[in-house]
Amino acid sequence: MAEPASVAAESLAGSRARAARTVLGQVVLPGEELLLPEQEDAEGPGGAVERPLSLNARACSRVRVVCGPGLRRCGDRLLVTKCGRLRHKEPGSGSGGGVYWVDSQQKRYVPVKGDHVIGIVTAKSGDIFKVDVGGSEPASLSYLSFEGATKRNRPNVQVGDLIYGQFVVANKDMEPEMVCIDSCGRANGMGVIGQDGLLFKVTLGLIRKLLAPDCEIIQEVGKLYPLEIVFGMNGRIWVKAKTIQQTLILANILEACEHMTSDQRKQIFSRLAES
């Protein structure tokens, strides 16, 4: 009796699954199962066949699908773990399945290897700084992770300083680790942020929107006042203008632009330019 029950469970799971290409741009919920197109012989009979993602290299040797945030491989299945809109990016070479991910409006930041973030130094323990990055636990930062730092020439980092760096270790089983140098040992803009300026927090979705290559908001903001600005993938923005009033205006604009249309932004920028 166990065998018919397992077959019935598999058929029930397959009936609930939906083809990923039919729900692109739509809202998906945690627990949903997605079916990805398996590329066999494009010229052959039948064309592409919708079936659950298989991790067997021999069974699916010509398809390489990358799962981004919000998706998880579970055996030979692809499951949704976050609520949001399903997105897809075609591969640059034109072969393979591309990248699938879920675009969600989550507020809590989860450290990801390679992300550039803004942190706050909360403590110093021996040769390690503890940095608050907005995650579930603080990140560790070695004093040797700065450009030109040696045992004799230590960086001037104090508790309360703002740090702009990137993650080199970020997984669920280990403490996040940050550095302020790139692979060549150069700072490349990372390190201790200036004492002046204003630090504020926005949603993670707004950060991704502002860092998009085709985003016009930063170009419009740059035309108003001379400014310095730093974006952290953990939802933090540091901005500095010539005066405190200009700094506050820029911060308010960036916070409000998430819920404004393009025409509304143009009206606000035109009023500020006239004033």
Swiss-Prot record:
Cross-link Glycyl lysine isopeptide (Lys-Gly) (interchain with G-Cter in SUMO2) mapped to chain: K151
Major subcellular site: cytoplasm
Keyword Kinase: no
Keywords from the UniProt entry: Acetylation, Cytoplasm, Disease variant, Exosome, Isopeptide bond, Neurodegeneration, Nucleus, RNA-binding, rRNA processing, Ubl conjugation
CDD domains reported in the protein's UniProt record: KH-I_Rrp40 (cd22526), S1_Rrp40 (cd05790)
One BP annotation, GO: poly(A)-dependent snoRNA 3'-end processing
Location within or outside the cell: Cytoplasm; Nucleus, Nucleolus; Nucleus
SUPFAM superfamilies attached to this UniProt entry: Eukaryotic type KH-domain (KH-domain type I) (SSF54791), Nucleic acid-binding proteins (SSF50249), Ribosomal L27 protein-like (SSF110324)
N-acetylalanine found at: A2
InterPro entries: Exosome_RNA_bind1/RRP40/RRP4, KH_dom_type_1, KH_dom_type_1_sf, NA-bd_OB-fold, RRP40_KH-I, RRP40_N, Rrp40_S1
A cellular-component GO term for this protein: cytoplasm
GO molecular function, a single term: RNA binding
Noted disease: Pontocerebellar hypoplasia 1B: A severe autosomal recessive neurologic disorder characterized by a combination of cerebellar and spinal motor neuron degeneration beginning at birth. There is diffuse muscle weakness, progressive microcephaly, global developmental delay, and brainstem involvement.
Function, in words: Non-catalytic component of the RNA exosome complex which has 3'->5' exoribonuclease activity and participates in a multitude of cellular RNA processing and degradation events. In the nucleus, the RNA exosome complex is involved in proper maturation of stable RNA species such as rRNA, snRNA and snoRNA, in the elimination of RNA processing by-products and non-coding 'pervasive' transcripts, such as antisense RNA species and promoter-upstream transcripts (PROMPTs), and of mRNAs with processing defects, thereby limiting or excluding their export to the cytoplasm.
Stated family: Belongs to the RRP40 family.
Subunit relationships: Component of the RNA exosome core complex (Exo-9), composed of EXOSC1, EXOSC2, EXOSC3, EXOSC4, EXOSC5, EXOSC6, EXOSC7, EXOSC8 and EXOSC9; within the complex interacts with EXOSC5 and EXOSC9. The catalytically inactive RNA exosome core complex (Exo-9) associates with the catalytic subunit EXOSC10/RRP6. Exo-9 may associate with DIS3 to form the nucleolar exosome complex, or DIS3L to form the cytoplasmic exosome complex. Exo-9 is formed by a hexameric base ring consisting of the heterodimers EXOSC4-EXOSC9, EXOSC5-EXOSC8 and EXOSC6-EXOSC7, and a cap ring consisting of EXOSC1, EXOSC2 and EXOSC3.
Protein name per the record: Exosome complex component RRP40
Gene that this polypeptide is encoded by: EXOSC3
